[in-house]
Amino acid sequence: MPLNYPAKIKEETDINPPKANNVVTFILSDDKAYYYRGEFYPKSRPGENGPTELTEANFGSGENSVRKLLASWNDYVIKNKAILEQKLDKKQIADTTFKRKLDDLTKKPEAVKVLIKTDDKALCKSFIDLVDELKIANVGVIAPTDLSPGEKELLKEKN
């Protein structure tokens, strides 16, 4: 599974990041996983819906399981994958065509994109579990990135 690493930007440059479109950020700490959707808004500069809040997710089952959350967020890819699988089963497309079209689906704007951020206490097992769940949910764009200072503060409040 390819992971996308963002380019390192020098601290003194004043480049605004692109708008987050259909993005979920997972933050791993100890054996816990937290997430937020969309852009990060600190308490000092809240967005339209207020500052960003972290929600805890789990790798088990239930309403807040990573698998269930990803399935609901990535329904565009999952529904279209089912259509492609039907065509593959009926021999209307080749398996190489299926793989290419599925790969194209995961890169469309409607497909969910995931940022993975970890602190110093995050367990390797949690990272691997999350990447496994992302693969199961057919998430095509996964980018491990560093925690921002605002995200670190928010994480301290949760731990």
Regions found by a protein language model. Give the residues of each.
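Soluble extracytoplasmic domains of inner/organellar membrane proteins
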Residues: L102-I142, E151
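Extracytoplasmic juxtamembrane/flexible linker immediately downstream
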Residues: M1-K68, Y76-K101, L105-T106, A143-N159
